[in-house]
Amino acid sequence: MPAFDPEFSGGALMDINIYNIHYVVGLFGKPKNIEYYPNIEKEIDTSGILILDYDRFKCVCVGAKDCKSPIANNIQGNNGCIYVDTPVNSCENLKVIMNDGTTTVFNENKYDNRMVSEFMEFIDTIHNNDLERCYKMLDHSLIVSEVQTIARKKAGIIFKSDIN
């Protein structure tokens, strides 16, 4: 499988952890420092912990292709947390849980398929020739790619495509 093949620039960071990176960068922007601690088997990271440092707080992103556990995404703060029990690329049933136990649930997904809203935004961007939105999303993608590249290179994960 390409996800586990260094010949195809695979691995957990490149595959499953990309969703976490998009999520965190979308919320907080570019981190100040990036570290990745992979578990390497047969020349590929089958899982790993990515730590993104934002000076005042840290984000820990776990991506694993070698095991399975219940999905849990938490953003913890002084007054409570934001909890999502679905993959970050769908963010269904986002719960704001305050320290006093008060819970508010949000679900902005209007469609059964998580991709519908994204495709509708693409269509809207194209039809309205919204170059500002286009470049904003491009900048986001470039930061995500930079985070991913720095993380794997600092962890010593080098692909053949890096050498050529």
Roles of regions detected by a PLM:
Residues 4-6, 103, 129:
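Short amphipathic alpha-helical segments at helix-loop
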